[in-house]
C-alpha cells in the first residue's frame, strides 16, 4: 500500500523520536494558497485564547471559581460559535479528558494530534507555541485543519485538579452540571486540550 507524505514523515519521526510539525498541501502549487489560511487560523486561535484568559482572570477575581466555571460553560462556547459563524469555519475546544462530551470530545484527527502534542511536550517543547497544521481529505471535502495546544494554568486546578484541590462547593456544582465529567486530576503544565479550527477548502 502506498504511503502518504504524512505517513512517511510520521514513520521517520517515530524512528527518531521526533515528531515534526508539517503543512500538507494537495499539490505543490497549493502551499502558497494555504499559508494565508494557516496564518489566519493561528491569529484567530491566539486571539480566542487571549480573550478567554482575560475573561477568566477577571471573573475569577470578581466571583471565584463559580464565576470562572461560567466562562468555560457559557462564554467560551459562545465565542467559538460567533467566530465560526463570522468566518465560515468550525472553531471549538477539545480536551484530553472531557467535561462536556457534547462539546469537547475530539474526533479521530484531533485525538491523534493531542497524542502528538503530549509526545512533543515530553521532548521539551512548550505548549505556548505548539501547533499542528494539515490539509485533510474527508467524505465532506478537503479542509485545512489547525490545532493549538492548551496547557493547564496553575489557577485551573480548583476546577480541574485532584479531589483535594477542588473545593466541595465547586465539586457539587460540577457534579450537578457535568454528570459524566472526566476533566479532573490535571496538574499545572499538563496538556488540557487544544483549540481546533477546521476551514473548508472546496469553496
Describe these PLM feature segments.
Residues 1-5:
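Positively charged n-region of N-terminal signal peptides that target proteins for export
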Residues 9-20:
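Bacterial N-terminal signal peptides
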Residues 157-164:
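Detector for the c-type heme attachment site
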Residues 27-153, 165-203:
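Extracytoplasmic c-type cytochrome modules immediately beyond a signal peptide or single-pass transmembrane anchor
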Residues 20-28:
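Signal peptide processing junction and immediate N-terminal pro/mature segment
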Amino acid at each position: 500500500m502506498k504511503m502518504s507524505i504524512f505517513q512517511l514523515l510520521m514513520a521517520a519521526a517515530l524512528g527518531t523520536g521526533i515528531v515534526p510539525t508539517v503543512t500538507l498541501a494537495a499539490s505543490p502549487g497549493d502551499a502558497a494558497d494555504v499559508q494565508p489560511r494557516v496564518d489566519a487560523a493561528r491569529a484567530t486561535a491566539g486571539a480566542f485564547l487571549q480573550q478567554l484568559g482575560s475573561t477568566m482572570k477577571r471573573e475569577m477575581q470578581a466571583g471565584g471559581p463559580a464565576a470562572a466555571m461560567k466562562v468555560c460553560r457559557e462564554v467560551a462556547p459562545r465565542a467559538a460559535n460567533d467566530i465560526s459563524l463570522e468566518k465560515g469555519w468550525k472553531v471549538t475546544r477539545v480536551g484530553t479528558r472531557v467535561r462536556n462530551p457534547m462539546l469537547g470530545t475530539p474526533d479521530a484527527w484531533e485525538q491523534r494530534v493531542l497524542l502528538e502534542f503530549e509526545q512533543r511536550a515530553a521532548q521539551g517543547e512548550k505548549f505556548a507555541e505548539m501547533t499542528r497544521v494539515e490539509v485533510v481529505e474527508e467524505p465532506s471535502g478537503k479542509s485545512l485543519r489547525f490545532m493549538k495546544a492548551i496547557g493547564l494554568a496553575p489557577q485551573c486546578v480548583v476546577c480541574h485538579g485532584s479531589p483535594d484541590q477542588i473545593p466541595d462547593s465547586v465539586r457539587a456544582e460540577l457534579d450537578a452540571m457535568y454528570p459524566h465529567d472526566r476533566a479532573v486530576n490535571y496538574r499545572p503544565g499538563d496538556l488540557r486540550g487544544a483549540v481546533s479550527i477546521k476551514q473548508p477548502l472546496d469553496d
